[in-house]
Amino acid sequence: MSNGYEDHMAEDCRDDIGRTNLIVNYLPQNMTQEELRSLFSSIGEVESAKLIRDKVAGHSLGYGFVNYVTAKDAERAISTLNGLRLQSKTIKVSYARPSSEVIKDANLYISGLPRTMTQKDVEDMFSRFGRIINSRVLVDQTTGLSRGVAFIRFDKRSEAEEAITSFNGHKPPGSSEPITVKFAANPNQNKNMALLSQLYHSPARRFGGPVHHQAQRFRFSPMGVDHMSGISGVNVPGNASSGWCIFIYNLGQDADEGILWQMFGPFGAVTNVKVIRDFNTNKCKGFGFVTMTNYEEAAMAIASLNGYRLGDKILQVSFKTNKSHK
């Protein structure tokens, strides 16, 4: 099972044969389908616009598809609207790709990179293997330097395989240690769950402000007993159509949704936040939930924020299991 928008691409884009169909990522959660159509109609005639929503709850998942009548208008929409700032989001506009086995599982996890390498450096290094759909270098928010970890999604799995064969164990210029290049984890495959543990144990200062680092002994492992007891698949983190749900425990009474947006937003696309409140006092009961569209971004948010201090509270952050928290 793929994560993010690729599941929907199978049903929404399978008949697309031209370059008129676009996918729009990182939309504001309160943006409507009509507003999506209106925005893209300013470029040219839109044949269809579809905002993808949670099939049960009905809320926006933060992305949609726009199909133009002409390929020229679609190309102009990408050059005009890609990177547009909408509310607190910067939208990404690109061609939608029909789902097929050829393009599945083409996402790489790279670690051990020199801290001086930028996103452009990483793309330049890997572009010889094929077309890069997107890339992300994880940056320490305090120092502004790379954390030596990156994700790259190729157009085809064969391109990703070639990159692994050529670069796994390779020493890039400026590095005294070999880098690790492998397929990014699919959390529905137990053999790949070690990635979360790797992310969790890595240096994890990602969020500035009132969050302060705590000693490792205070950290609550997202791979703890409650999660590992479900290794058969019952309680391991899995993604429903709504994305990857993260459980945050030990929030202060005054915590609100704005704090969660501020904390998790820097890691990637957040589609929903919820603080659980006491019915009588309307104060936070100490926990909340955040839903993110991308597994790697959710895993990194957990690795960075679990065990950190918010106010006078030490947060416990983990993937939500199938067990209900009351």
UniProtKB/Swiss-Prot annotation:
The modification Phosphoserine is found at residues 2, 100, 158, 197, 202, 221, 318. Phosphorylated by MAPKAPK2. Phosphorylated by PRKCD. Methylated at Arg-217 by CARM1 in macrophages in response to LPS challenge. PANTHER family: EUKARYOTIC TRANSLATION INITIATION FACTOR 3 SUBUNIT G. It comes from Rattus norvegicus. Monomer and homodimer (in vitro). Interacts with ANP32A. Interacts with ZNF385A; the interaction is indirect and mRNA-dependent and may regulate p53/TP53 expression. Identified in a mRNP complex, at least composed of DHX9, DDX3X, ELAVL1, HNRNPU, IGF2BP1, ILF3, PABPC1, PCBP2, PTBP2, STAU1, STAU2, SYNCRIP and YBX1. Interacts with AGO1 and AGO2. Interacts with IGF2BP1. Interacts with IGF2BP2 and IGF2BP3. Interacts with HNRNPL. Interacts with DHX36; this interaction occurs in a RNA-dependent manner. Interacts with ILF3; this interaction occurs in a RNA-dependent manner. Interacts with PLEKHN1. Signal peptide: none annotated. The first RRM (RNA recognition motif) domain is essential for binding to AU-rich elements. This is ELAV-like protein 1.
